[in-house]
Regions:
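N-terminal hydrophobic/helix-forming segments and targeting peptides
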Residues: 1-209, 214
Length: 214
């Protein structure tokens, strides 16, 4: 598996040089980790520990990564359920980590369930927007789009759906504004034990963007 954002390269190298570019999990020897290398001029491969251990230490390895970086535009998927008011609530998730079930597929599936549930409700008070894009850069661009189109004033709140596919306790990360109604709603509506995390801009997902000033 190629490390995300790897550059184009074609060369022959020794195992000593190659192993610096290989990523694996020593704890889960059959698992292949997901690694990205955003904005660095580098390359690499992800593999299982078992595969790594089977590699010859004396052979030469031919590396041929036929990759290219091309100018394009960021794609954002948006679906809207109109309510009686323009007061808008956003459900956000991302699809920028290929081949990952919990971190990637669970968010859009959960969003689809919420969409179908809200779609059946007549005379909705709020307008709901469902956003699917790339993590971090996606909501930054989308919020800028809303600002430029004078829609940012209508946003009342946002919920980020990520890593919701495991049969474990629900983790709920509160918004920066502790008194926001959504925090109170979540605490009352979750019908089983959950872990509440305080907002922390130094880590997390798209909550860093939706709860940040500006």
């Amino acid at each position: 598996h190629l490390v995300g954002y790897s550059k184009k390269i074609k060369k022959e190298i020794s195992f000593k040089e190659l192993k610096k570019k290989l990523f694996f999990s020593s704890m889960k020897k059959s698992a292949i980790p997901y690694v990205t290398n955003y904005y660095n001029n580098d390359w690499g491969f992800c593999l299982s520990k078992k595969t790594f251990d089977s590699l010859s230490k004396t052979k030469k390895y031919k590396i041929n990564i036929d990759a290219k970086f091309s100018k394009s535009s960021l794609k954002v998927a948006e679906a809207t359920l109109k309510g009686k008011t323009n007061k808008t609530f956003i459900f956000d998730t991302y699809i920028c980590h290929p081949s990952m079930a919990n971190n990637e597929l669970s968010g859009p599936l959960c969003m689809l369930l919420i969409y179908n549930m809200l779609r059946k409700i007549k005379n909705k008070q709020f307008t709901y927007k469902f956003i699917i894009s790339s993590e971090t850069i996606g909501p930054i661009s989308y919020l800028d789009y809303l600002k430029n189109n004078k829609q940012i004033k209508n946003i009342y709140g946002a919920a980020i759906l990520t890593c919701v596919g495991m049969n474990k306790k629900i983790f709920f990360k509160s918004s920066k504004n502790e008194k926001h109604f959504f925090n109170k709603l979540m605490r009352k509506s979750i019908n089983k034990k959950f872990v509440e995390l305080r907002f922390d801009p130094s880590n997390g997902s798209n909550d860093r963007q939706y709860s940040s000033p500006g």
